Amino acid sequence: MPTIKDVMVAKPTARQIADCSKWPIWTCGVSKFEWEYTQTEKCLILEGKVTVHDPGYPNQSVSFGAGDFVQFPDGLKCVWNVIEPVKKHYDFE
């Protein structure tokens, strides 16, 4: 089973930015919620700040924000803590 350590955060390439611009947009206000990925998700964070952690281990976390390209693996269970309202392009594989 994937863990938070399997979440990849990087600065996007020019190609990734161009590809992401065709993807749908998702927005979320400041909140905290549990999420389970049933597919791999790739996203480009346009606005906001988020910390995601394993449900039982809040000290094992990853943070990302505007300008980051993030990939979440299929099967990951996590808790999203949206610190600043988030807007992202996203795609599921």
Question: At which residue positions do the language-model features occur?
Answer:
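Short, surface-exposed secondary-structure edge patches
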Residues: 42, 60-61
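Transition segment at domain starts
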Residues: 1-18
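Short, conserved beta-strand element in jelly-roll/cupin
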Residues: 38-52
